[in-house]
Amino acid sequence: MEPFFNLSKQVFFSKIETLNAILLDVRNADEFQEGHLENAILIPFENPDFISLMSDFDTSANYLVYCRSGNRGVKACLMMRSMGFIGEIFHLDKGYEGLK
C-alpha cells in the first residue's frame, strides 16, 4: 500500500469533486483564517494533540490533505498511515501556496 499519493492541483481538485473523501487542512489557525478550501477541516499538524485529534476520524475513509507548501502535509500523511489509516490518502503537491 502506498503511504499516500502526491497530486497536482488539477488532479487534487478533480478528486474533491468525484471522491467521497474528507478534506483536511493541516496548516495553523492563522493560515486557515487567511484562506482555505471550501469544506476543509482544520487539524493543525503542529498541534501537540494532532494524533489525539486524528484518532476521532474514520481510519477507513479517504482523505485529501494539504498544508501551505507541502512539507507539513507530507508529514501528516505519513503520520496518518502510521496511525493505521487504511483508506486512500491524497496530498496536494506544493500545498495551498501552489494554487496561486
What are the residue ranges of the model-derived segments?
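Rhodanese-like catalytic fold shared by cysteine-dependent sulfurtransferases
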Residues: 1-21, 29-62, 68-100
